[in-house]
A protein has these predicted regions:
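Alpha-helical interface subdomain recognition
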Residues: 1-87, 99-104, 111-116, 131-132, ...
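Short Ser/Thr-interspersed hydrophobic loop/turn segments at strand-loop and sheet-helix junctions
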Residues: 47, 71-75, 168, 184-189, ...
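Short Gly/Pro-enriched turn/cap motifs at secondary-structure boundaries
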Residues: 112, 127-130, 154-157, 171-173, ...
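A short, Trp-centered hydrophobic/proline-enriched beta-strand micro-motif
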Residues: 115-123
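Conserved hydrophobic/aromatic beta-strand scaffold that supports enzyme active sites
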Residues: 120, 134-138, 145, 163-167, ...
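Flexible, small-/acidic-enriched active-site or ligand-binding loops
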Residues: 134, 189-218
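A short core secondary-structure module
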Residues: 145, 149-193
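A short, charged helix-loop
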Residues: 210-232
Length: 378
């Protein structure tokens, strides 16, 4: 795919910022678990926190191809930050734009798009991951308020977000059609951060357990219509999966670049590693896999921009890119030898960061199920 002028400018701008500002400090954030508050403000100023939000709502008004290019470049600098940016764009801004009332758009979108307010997506629960229809968190009417009770788990930015998009059961008898979506300011009484996960990677991105204890919000905080929550959640997961695929490509590319640099500097048997055919062949395979995944991502994003169905293509991109990224990062470690296993070199961190891409926003086997159902249709 040949990028247009605007897309190329976005790619170059984000690459410059990520390589100069995010990459040099990524290891520090990984070790200290420091939340990237300033970096997110910077990205907001660059338009990266609401890229597809129209100008009238304070966004950059760009296409989805530009968004995935930005996510890929950010991920090449710091995978943890790219997760926050992907969720903010694909899920938080995407849902508010598509389903929010005019008042909700006026109140929330400009602050989401600028990065002033960070959002978190509260769908997963302790016993519910892939089967979103089985959530237990409930919301009950009480006068002019909804009262939320329940627990959400593995919530990206759950501690640091200003607003949560929460999915809860409003009609237990209605099954999938009894789930609704709500905007919940995180400073609301009854919104409790009860656990911060100690994760394998992506340490700069907090992942929290959120407990709702008689959390009262106004009736007007309902997003869309009552009972639309399941549809809302699933309608934007395809977009989210393209974003995760893009970040997988970015992290794989970072590991590949580190491997190329190391292979050109390190000598074995009197010559640089890159001169050994085994290493050269490994690099060739890595480069081919990265490019294939990159093109899958762009294809899915192009379909989305055209308003065409992209469920299958989004799942293909996420499945292939996330699997590819782990393999490429593993190969990058192998090229580094023992140095690849220690934190002095970035490939150890990138490998830990990339592993979750096969789990969140739909595990790999869920993507296979989606693809199988789509290709089996006659």
């Amino acid at each position: 795919m040949i990028l247009n002028t605007e897309q190329s400018m976005v790619q170059e701008m984000m690459r410059n910022y990520a390589q100069n500002q995010l990459k040099p400090t990524a290891a520090h954030r990984d070790k200290t678990h420091e939340f990237p508050a300033q970096e997110l403000k910077d990205l907001g100023a660059l338009g990266a926190m609401g890229m597809t939000v129209p100008d009238e709502w304070g966004g950059a008004g760009m296409d989805y191809v530009s968004l995935v290019l930005a996510i890929e470049e950010i991920a090449a600098g710091d995978g943890a930050i790219s997760t926050i940016v992907s969720v903010q764009n694909s899920l938080i801004c995407g849902i508010t734009l598509a389903y929010g009332s005019e008042q909700q758009k006026q109140t929330y979108l400009p602050k989401f798009a600028s990065g002033e307010w960070l959002g978190c997506f509260c769908l997963t629960e302790p016993h519910v991951g892939s089967d979103a229809s089985a959530i237990l968190c409930k919301a009950e009417r009480d006068g002019d308020h909804w009262v939320l009770n329940g627990v959400k788990q593995f919530i990206t930015s759950g501690k640091n977000a200003q607003v949560a998009l929460v999915f809860a059961v409003t009609d237990k008898q209605a099954g999938k059609k009894g789930i609704s979506c709500f905007l919940v300011p995180t400073n609301t009484q009854g919104y409790l951060v009860t656990r911060i996960e100690d994760k394998m990677g992506q340490h700069a991105s907090d992942t929290a357990t959120i407990t709702f204890e008689d959390c009262r919000i106004p009736l007007e905080n309902l997003v869309g219509q009552e009972g639309e929550g399941y549809k809302i959640a699933l309608s934007n997961l395809a977009a989210g999966r393209i974003g995760i695929a893009a970040q997988s490509v970015g992290m794989a590319r970072a590991a590949f670049d580190a491997a190329v640099q190391y292979a050109n500097e390190r000598k074995a048997f009197g010559v640089e590693l890159v001169q050994h055919q085994a290493v050269g062949f490994r690099l060739a395979d890595m480069a081919t896999q990265i490019e294939a995944a990159h093109q899958l991502v762009l294809h899915a994003a192009t379909l989305k921009d055209a308003g065409l169905p992209c469920l299958k293509e989004a799942s293909m991109a996420k499945l292939f890119a996330s699997t590819m990224a782990e393999r490429v990062c593993s190969d990058a470690i192998q090229i580094h030898g023992g140095y690849g296993y220690v934190s002095d070199f970035p490939v150890e961190r990138i490998y830990r960061d990339v592993r979750v891409s096969q789990i969140y926003e739909g595990a790999s086997d869920i993507q296979r199920l989606v693809i199988a159902r789509e290709v089996a249709q006659v």
